[in-house]
Amino acid sequence: MKVRIKFSKEGPVKFVGHLDTMRYFQKAIRRANLPVAFSGGYSPHMIMSFAAPLGVGTESLGEYFDLELVETIPTSEITRRLDEVMVEGVHVISTRQVEDGKAGKAMSLVAAADYYVEFRPGKEPEISWRDKINDFLAQPEIKVMKKTKRSEKEIDIRPFIYKMELQGDKIFMMLASASANYTKPELVTDTFFSWLGVELPEFAYTIKRLEVYADKGNEEEHKFVTLEALGEEVE
């Protein structure tokens, strides 16, 4: 049985890195007494994979990992067992069964993610910026310097900003998140304010990831669906 588990990560645990989060869930799965499948060979390990690493210091309401079990268990039972052993700040939201070959691996499916960007108290720029987002997006190109392993290169990130708008006091954005075009919300935020002539101070804002999506569309039109929606509940 292959399942996709959705969880949130808020509060102080946002400072726990990706590898430590993986290790934490491995221990939690044991405490939850789930019949997890292991790989073969001299060094067997749990068959699990996370969808998209979350940056240190970023909260999230929509994180995912896939897990192989050797028995079929109701998905609601898996959610309950895991959530009961979570630390404060981590909440298991749902479990869905996914089929190999149909839904694919969570990591390879990731195409987009959406975020909230919110200024910390007293850190919001004093200039008028709220009505400038549409003008920013109206540019045919948004060129930035992006670091690679060996150097820097100029790229156009405009095609990777699928949506950006003001929602209340927060900036909402949906960005490309596939490995080939992964676009950080920090990069978009800093580029926007730099375009306005403002250099934001360090730690001026917080970021919360809201959801992660696969793209079931084609080259002409995107059709984003949540990774959760690609699975189904099992009674």
What are these regions (language model features)?
Residues 78-86, 128-137, 188:
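Short amphipathic alpha-helices in soluble, non-transmembrane regions
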Residues 38-69:
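Short, charge-patterned binding micro-sites
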Residues 61-116:
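Ordered, amphipathic secondary-structure segments that act as subunit-interaction surfaces
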Residues 12, 22, 31, 35-40:
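Short Lys/Arg-rich amphipathic alpha-helical segments
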Residues 7-9, 67-73, 117-123, 173-177:
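Short beta-strand-to-loop capping motifs
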Residues 6-12, 16, 20:
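Extended, well-folded interaction surfaces typified by the phenylalanyl-tRNA synthetase beta subunit core
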Residues 138-235:
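Core RNA-modification/binding signature centered on pseudouridine synthases
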